[in-house]
Amino acid sequence: MGENYALELRDISKSFGSVQANDHVDLTLRKSEILAILGENGSGKTTLMNMIYGIYYPDEGHIFVNGKEVTIRSPKDSYELGIGMVHQHFKLVDVLTAAENIVLGLPGKGKLDMKRITEDIQKLADKYGFELDLSHKIYEMSVSQKQTVEIIKMLYRGARILILDEPTAVLTPQESDRLFDILRNMRKDGCSIMIITHKLQEVLALSDRVAILRKGKYIDTVETAQANAQSLSEMMVGGRVDLNIDRPEPENVKKRLVVKGLNCKNKEEVKTLDDVDLIVNAGEILGIAGISGSGQKEFLEAIAGLQAIESGSITLLDDNGKGTELAGMDSISINKAGISLAFVPEDRIGMGLVGDMDMTDNMMLRSYRNGKSPFLDRKGPKALALKIKEQLEVMTPSISAPVRQMSGGNVQKVLVGREIAQNPKVLLVAFPTRGVDVNTSHVIYRLLNEQKKKGVAVVCVIEDLDVVLELCDRIAVFCGGKISGIEDGRTATKEEIGLLMTKHEKGGTQA
């Protein structure tokens, strides 16, 4: 046992039924280092982190913190050991202030001295370079500010070992850079940090070492300075990986969808889309970029008939230029009218698929209304499920297994495969590769390009700007429910898109 290790895992194993999530894993985290954890979906990264944080308990193995063997049976145990975890989905109370969230749940007697506590929190924030108004309520904050609250909350509770799950998933490039500066400051102060991410360039820019897992097994830990994106990818998948994203030239481009003056409000009567005008062309991939909550999700849902429209028009044009108005139609009406539109939602299990149902039954969700018999036809959906499993290499014991048991990447393959099988004229995809490993991401990029070549109008909300710039023909940037710019994917830069994500000025071209 090395004295310089803040954390060491020895021979850790964890299984869920017949599924071996972690298989005799060894891992070390040095004091004052940033360690990246890499692996494909289903490689056991999250399970391993959840055992360190006390959400799961290992079946076998030993955990050491600062050289001493410990037992972690709950997040309370991890807190007491100085371990904190910031999940991808934040655990905050919207109606409380930042300061109130940071101290929420801490032991104490009587009334809290919030003035003194706020001063202490502010000193901690200033120490590491956080910029945050502690008096603001959570619902008033941006995603990056909410993440800041989560990190400060862990530090205030004494965390010296910090685990971050996909920390930049919904941040702009500028926000990501600020976060990296803060993490480097924390490292200088003696904190040890573990990050789970699929963004290889961020791993190379930020981490000191990289640990790789594959199919539940520990593969190796390498010094970041001696690695590159290609070598890390090959270690993750166990073979050669092509990291290039193709962008074939658009052919026979024609208007497919015309959106004019689109306005939407949420249940609280707050405007989510504000006078949006946009043309979507057949035979192209239109990328939608923006900070989380800028209206991207609502834009796709409005087209798909899942979002009430206050005003405006959404016109679907056929090959002869004849238009069908979609505004005012719900998703069932769109389906019954035979309009060939497919939608891959952000919420894969919930809105997209039913987690407790198997692949065959999830295929039927798209077709059961079209049956002419009182009995459900399972032959077609079963054949489609088998085809998707084979062609997209879906990792599942059987098509009869509930999709909830699959990793995120395999769930996404099932969902995208089902929607593409409808032969749509318009394909709407929200966050196609969020939380998805490199190999699966490239499978999905290939599928989207195949649809583009077939003349489908593809609209993609993508959070990774590197991917947006490599994959998309045009990029519409949303900010505060408005379109702040429409750029050519071949000439735009990451910095330009990042700035447009924080501006409300209209710009760009509809061409």
Residue spans for each PLM region:
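Glycine-rich phosphate-binding loops of nucleotide-dependent enzymes
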Residues: 2-511
